[in-house]
């Protein structure tokens, strides 16, 4: 059979002419045009394939043989409409540049490409897609799998509205914007399908208001890692929970002991232990050689029993036991921490040191006082007693150690940290109000001899109590002018305190919902992972790191290929989204996990 090409109207069509009894010719339209499928935009190999298939089809028809099933699905010759001539018949659309004859870089850069997204056609240039060669559309080898030689275009059965943002990513040089009519989970799925990369995904999360998940660093040494997980993360294992329970009990015992030892009955008993009564002195002997000896003997019982009686104090024993546990816990955590510098700068670890430090100072002071001649002068004793009281007060900070084991206290701390600006404004407004109204009430009550305000600084207390709407009543205005000032002070205090409160409450709700959503997401991820393992759907496409808890596992791997994405691997293992809005995150998680096997969501 002989195949020859004849020019059509556009100068690039072809006509088949067969020889012998199997000769076949191109189907001509009434106007004399060729009705064969357009081939001007195809490369040489595609043209040969199309012509060979068409000739085989006609030979089979002339020989009276039935057509094979695949051959029956080939498009029949038809006349091109005006739209087809403008769109599909355009020789510049959908050209596969990797199979064409060599062209200069300028013409290849401006060559047009036709992309069909579920029936909606987009047109762009090769140079636009080539800006990101590692993506699906930017890599000629990757996008070749989606090329349709019959329609001369790239076809993707994906979400149509999302492609506006994907194409804008190429046109703008890397700016990713989600269309308003596309949900977050659908657009995130499209980003992964078109393989825009992790950097584009991170920028998308930041633009949408998502927070980057904090990475928990772990020590490299296996033994240190296990110890760190046990003492730092109570939810990592059963032994970690046991250690956390013991730590909480010790903290509570220490706080209860700190409070009980101030009761009058216990305080009097401790004073008796510390300073036992001096036994009655015998009559003074006559002056002589034995006088100094008897004086020394009379002072002996007041010094010797002090040290053992102090160590025998039950509160001292309980306090020593608690401090031993706190010291052991702090040293173990310091030994196993991944970074000594970060450990030293952590506020919670500073609180641990502050909670332990007073005990050793108190112990050293007690031992110094028990030494012969350590009593010293009364002035030194009063000074050491004042210092001890301040140091012992620091022990109350041990209550903050509970925040390590309480999510609620952690949320409260993050709320206060995020609201420092609002709290500063609140204190500044209160300071202005206190100065203003204390001065006003002083001068309003100055002529009254029974006034409670002797000076402006003396009126500061009244202004603070009134602005905070506490009103103890120990200081109050008497005159009419003073009462008017007091009324204005109370109203100003209510308005001043009410202004920053909504912002603080909003921050608290934000951190609270973020924590609860994170727990739900981790539980959902763990449940879905268990289901996949039970059904045998886990493949070797991801590298898994073994650890004590699923929440501490990190998954990684290369970008998915288009086939694996079509099969619908779980997107939650590759994209951890944390939203400011609880509703957005719940909707995203539900949509992502409800049906991961679908290819498009219109």
Swiss-Prot record:
InterPro entries: BTB/POZ_dom (IPR000210), Ion_trans_dom (IPR005821), K_chnl_volt-dep_Kv (IPR003968), K_chnl_volt-dep_Kv1 (IPR003972), K_chnl_volt-dep_Kv1.5 (IPR004052), SKP1/BTB/POZ_sf (IPR011333), T1-type_BTB (IPR003131), VG_K_chnl (IPR028325). It is found in: Cell membrane. Keywords: Cell membrane, Ion channel, Ion transport, Isopeptide bond, Lipoprotein, Membrane, Palmitate, Phosphoprotein, Potassium, Potassium channel, Potassium transport, Transmembrane, Transmembrane helix, Transport, Ubl conjugation, Voltage-gated channel. Glycosylated. Sumoylated on Lys-212, and Lys-525, preferentially with SUMO3. Sumoylation regulates the voltage sensitivity of the channel. Residues 1-202 are annotated as: Tetramerization domain. Expressed equally in atrium, ventricle, aorta and skeletal muscle. Weaker expression in brain. There is a cross-link at residues 212, 525 (Glycyl lysine isopeptide (Lys-Gly) (interchain with G-Cter in SUMO)). A motif (PDZ-binding) lies at residues 600-602. Induction: Expression regulated by cAMP in a tissue-specific manner. In primary cardiac cells, levels increase by 6-fold, and in GH3 cells, levels decrease 5-6-fold. Residues 261-314, 369-384, 443-456, 477-483 are extracellular. Pfam families: BTB_2, Ion_trans. The chain crosses the membrane at residues 239-260, 315-336, 348-368, 385-405, 421-442, 484-512. It catalyses: K(+)(in) = K(+)(out). A motif (Selectivity filter) lies at residues 469-474. GO terms for biological process: action potential; atrial cardiac muscle cell action potential; membrane hyperpolarization; membrane repolarization during atrial cardiac muscle cell action potential; membrane repolarization during bundle of His cell action potential; membrane repolarization during SA node cell action potential; negative regulation of cytosolic calcium ion concentration; Notch signaling pathway. The modification Phosphoserine is found at residues 81, 535, 546, 569. Residues 1-238, 337-347, 406-420, 513-602 are cytoplasmic. Residues 58-107, 523-543 are annotated as: Disordered. Residues 457-468, 469-476 dip into the membrane without crossing it. It comes from the Eukaryota. A lipid is attached at residue 337 (S-palmitoyl cysteine). The N-terminus may be important in determining the rate of inactivation of the channel while the C-terminal PDZ-binding motif may play a role in modulation of channel activity and/or targeting of the channel to specific subcellular compartments. Voltage-gated potassium channel that mediates transmembrane potassium transport in excitable membranes. Forms tetrameric potassium-selective channels through which potassium ions pass in accordance with their electrochemical gradient. The channel alternates between opened and closed conformations in response to the voltage difference across the membrane. This is Potassium voltage-gated channel subfamily A member 5. It comes from Rattus norvegicus (Rat). The gene is Kcna5.
